[in-house]
Amino acid sequence: MRDQLDEIQKHLDDGYGRAQQLDKVELPKRFYKDVGVAPVDGGFVVTLDGRQTRTPGHKHRITVPVAAIATAMAEEWSTQGEFIDATTMPMVRLINSAVESGEEMVPAFREEVLKFSAGDLLLYRADTPQELVGKQEAAWDYALTVLARHFGVSFQPTRGIIHQPQPKATLDRLAESLGDENLLTLTALVSMTGLTGSGLLTIGLLHQLFTPDQVWTAAHVDEDYQIGHWGQDEEAIHRRAKRRVEFDTAVMVVAALRP
């Protein structure tokens, strides 16, 4: 199961999925002219020159349940130039990953978010320096308080890296909060959890307890502290911006599929 989870995260990071790795030197040429969205039984499809898109390697036809996701995918296909650069297609990559993984991965994806939550970023605090301690407390205590009140649970944050078990009732309640989510939503939640390092922030965003900006800011307290003291190079700026696009894509999927 761990290998399968690593594989799905690799899809999200690298682009085109297990069946076709993106060549970073020679990108595939664009092979289509027209991009469309069409309703079908069970949802919507993206068409390239009238043909339904498939996952890399042509293994699976792609149908999504809502028009908003299909439209976002179509826009990514439309904006490709002479060559197809999958790194500029976060929605296509995310949906490909979900479809390639299959429904059998739903329990594993749910468990991945819960595993992060049990040893969450918000629960392990710095001892020093005091400035960082204060920044963590301001952002993370607020988040934990909101979560605790909403779900009727308690958390046991700690300082340092020594493992601090969380109450079983808390973990059980968090598990219940993910119990009805579908494959596409859970794929997006796994992506968000990996990008933020926090299952708790992800669950809070799922239940509309936090805005995307609040989650992103809380997830980067430590990084922003370091930037404030040491600065940030261009590569780091580019990398963070790319991750924010991936995060926003996952947020869009969750919002589009929300009842």
Question: Language-model segments: what does each one mean?
Answer:
Residues T79-E82, A148, G152, L205-F210, ...:
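Generic secondary-structure signature for well-ordered alpha-helical cores
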Residues R61, T128-K135, L184, A188-M192, ...:
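Conserved aromatic-histidine-acidic binding/catalytic patches
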Residues R2-E7, F44, H220-V221, I227-P259:
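Expand to "…catalyze enediolate/carbanion chemistry for C-C bond making/breaking, isomerization
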Residues V64-A68, A72, E104, A138, ...:
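Conserved active-site and cofactor/substrate-binding residues in soluble primary-metabolism enzymes
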Residues P165-E234:
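An internal, amphipathic alpha-helical element
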Residues P107-R173:
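Internal, conserved structured core segments that host functional sites
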Residues R2-E104:
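An N-terminal structural lobe/cap that precedes and organizes the functional/catalytic core
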